[in-house]
Regions:
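Ligand-binding beta-strand-loop-alpha-helix segment within the catalytic cores
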Residues: 133
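Short, solvent-exposed secondary-structure boundary/capping segments
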Residues: 120-129
Length: 287
């Protein structure tokens, strides 16, 4: 399954048990010797929500949250009838969705609204991604102060200005004039592993196109360059507003597609809406 190109292998743990998910993630994510993907996501029963999701990056490390992944988990859960959808889900001051699910994540229980077509298929999912975390000690970043906004950082002999946000997982956002010319693999890896970030960090380079649109490229912690990062797009929405560069309701253009974002003043939560697609099902042989 994928959310605008951010592709993971999903395992239905209502039916299967995965003894070593970190090892499986490394093997199955290999695009030459495995299925190929940005990582592995387990969909499992939950004691406190409709389902529980666990995310493993391509290098086997476990992630707290995946914005594109949670939309795919919602689609799979509804269409494969792992749980019955609940009632209405509303975005304050915006629209309402007739069906909802609660999904347990490493960032707590998140509620999603489902856009369902006439064939009972989920076409889009809106996720309440929760409130952004801005304090450096909670992101975490080895800096002092209340926020990390337009903070200088030295990377490979260059001084860059970063804004850091956690959406349950850590993000460093850098604004630039041309995202295509950025040496993303070189800079992304260096920033991810910089000593300012005790848990490493996701890295995003962003161009502001209009007051309501931006274009971004991502280097994901543990996975490298990806087509999209949902939590990253939410972090960019927040970072752009904090820097006075953009409005709180905007559209993010990612290499894999677009996401609609809203950092709501009423409840301080970030709402993300986008598609989710199931590509194929298969059987992975035990080795």
């Amino acid at each position: 399954m994928h959310g605008i190109g951010n592709d993971y292998v999903y395992v239905n743990c209502f039916e299967e048990q995965v003894e070593d998910p970190a090892a499986l993630a490394r093997i199955i994510s290999d695009r030459h010797r495995g299925v190929g993907g940005d990582g592995l996501i387990l969909i499992a029963p939950s004691q406190t929500a409709d389902v529980r999701m666990r995310i493993f990056n391509a290098d086997g490390s476990e992630a707290e949250m995946c914005g594109n992944g949670i939309r795919c988990v919602a689609k799979y859960t509804y269409e494969h009838k792992l749980a019955q959808a609940g009632g209405e889900f509303s975005v304050p001051g915006q629209r309402s969705f007739p069906a909802s699910l609660n999904i347990e994540t490493g960032n707590g229980i998140l509620t999603v609204g489902l856009i369902i077509d006439d064939t009972d298929k989920v076409r889009k999912v809106c996720v309440n991604m929760g409130q952004p975390i801005l304090s450096p000690q909670d992101i975490p970043v080895n800096l002092t102060g209340e926020k990390v906004v337009a903070q200088p950082i030295n990377v490979l002999g260059r001084e860059l200005l970063m804004t850091c946000v956690s959406m349950g997982n850590p993000h460093a956002v850098f604004f630039c004039d041309d995202v295509r010319s950025i040496e993303l693999e070189k800079l992304g890896s260096a920033i991810e592993n910089h000593n300012l970030f005790p848990n490493r960090i996701n890295v995003h380079f962003v161009r502001i196109d209009k007051p309501v649109e931006f274009t971004m490229r991502t280097w994901e912690r543990g996975s490298g360059i990806t087509m999209a990062c949902g939590t990253g797009a939410c972090a960019v929405c927040v970072a752009a507003a904090l820097n006075g560069r953009q409005e709180r309701i905007c559209t993010g253009h990612l290499p894999g597609g677009d996401l609609n974002l809203h950092w709501c003043e009423e409840d301080n939560c970030v709402y993300m809406t986008g598609p989710a697609d199931e590509v194929f099902e298969g059987v992975w042989p035990e080795k």
